[in-house]
Amino acid sequence: VGFGLLAQPSITQVLTWFHSLLFQWQWELFLTDPFIFLFWIFIILTTFVWGRGLFCGWMCPFGSLSELIYKVAGAIGLKRFQFALPMKWHNRLKWIKYFVFFALLAVSVFSMGLAEILAEVEPFKTTFLVGMFNRAWPYTLFVAVLLGLSIFIERPFCKYLCPLGASLAMPSTFRWFGLKRKQECNSCKACAVGCGSLAIDEHGRIDHRECMHCLDCMILYTDEHACPPLAQERKRRTKAGLPLTPIGADGYYIPIKPVPAAKA
């Protein structure tokens, strides 16, 4: 999608729509690239259904490139250098992307041209549309720094700087579907340990505005060895000689039905 179709959605498109709504709507602005237009319809619909995670976590070209670098770096022996920021710092830095988004939105009201220049805070144009080696060195250096940070921190741009992610995070509050949770999730917090998005807080709550839908927590949700409530129930049943029934949609073992007494 990024390198092949050059179809990386951008905050510039969001600003263009906002500017057109305020001043003069022109369909030509949105139909010059039909694939991008259809892609945006898909993004908007899925954001209100599942939140930003489907696009940001699974379809964003730059986010995918950043995650690929992080995973490859871990696989070739650099995992010991990889780290996640402490939650207190993450909770402060995550607001930067919202500041960037609203700043660009405000500037676009007065000067769309200036807003497009400032939107270079997104590395998408340099990475996919023009190419890192076809631009002035400051742009190339900026992208190189972001991709270099991706070796050590999972998706740093997505979590802390991306104005497009911020614009999709806000409507994610009104999504129709969320991730499944157990009663014990508020106190257990085992999923938070492996959450690359740092979207699970100290109370076990998922912030769907930050969630990238990696689904690691959903894998743990039904893992009878790794999910603490399931592991405890598995050990209890094994010790008591009780059968291990399948795990239901609620994330718990299906209750054992008593066997009716045989008729005399």
State each model region's role:
Residues 1-194, 198-202, 209, 216-264:
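Non-ligating segments of multi-cofactor redox enzymes
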